[in-house]
Design a protein with these regions (language model features):
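Short Lys/Arg-enriched helix C-cap and helix-to-coil transition segments
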Residues: 131-138
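Major-groove recognition helix of helix-turn-helix-like DNA-binding domains
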Residues: 93, 118-126
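Active-site phosphate/pyrophosphate- and oxyanion-stabilizing loops and adjacent acidic/basic residues
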Residues: 60, 121, 156
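…primarily DNA-binding HTH/wHTH and HhH modules…
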Residues: 141-168
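Histidine- and aromatic-rich ligand-binding microenvironments
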Residues: 97, 128-131
């Protein structure tokens, strides 16, 4: 995912058990959570004061999540760009409870588009806010762990951490 740097955009780096994350926000809310980004690609930037406040809120929420003290990201101000269909899928992703999984076919049914399984998969893959909009909770119909921006090992770690998969 490419992020266009502007004077209003604020970014920060967050160390997590699954590797470093880069967060980006504008004055409207959090716009991206990126995995292992090259620092030259998205440098840390102060941005606008309101953007920094959104970064602080998101950083605290993610730290609480990884410490086992948060199971939901409700209340965070999100400002991700996407099509109406993508936003519909991302909204449905946000309703998958902590510790549970859903299939792509199940997600398509949830949004009232049962034949749109592939489109749901594509929208899932375009989610700019992984973890916060929990696309890692979507698995294949056969139970297989499929694509994730942070890689399959990170997806497996997150699902085990949430208790959705037995730890091996």
């Amino acid at each position: 995912m490419k992020i266009r740097m502007t004077e209003e955009l604020a970014t920060t780096r967050l160390e997590t058990p699954i590797g470093p994350l880069r967060l980006a926000a504008n004055p409207e809310g959090l716009v991206a959570v990126l995995f292992a980004v090259d620092p030259q690609e998205l440098p840390v930037s102060q941005g606008a004061a309101r953007a920094r406040a959104h970064l602080s809120d998101a950083g605290t929420a993610l730290e609480e999540y990884f410490a086992g003290r948060r199971t939901s990201f409700e209340g965070l101000k999100l400002a991700a760009n996407g099509t109406e269909f993508q936003r519909q899928v991302w909204g449905a992703l946000s309703r998958i409870p902590f510790g549970e999984t859903a299939t792509y076919a199940g997600m398509a049914r949830r949004i009232g588009r049962p034949s749109a399984v592939r489109a749901v998969g594509l929208a899932n893959g375009q989610n700019p806010l992984p973890i916060i909009v929990p696309c890692h909770r979507v698995i294949g119909s056969n139970g297989a762990l499929t694509g994730f921006a942070g890689g399959i090992p990170a997806k497996k770690w997150l699902l085990e951490f949430e208790g959705a998969l037995p730890r091996v």
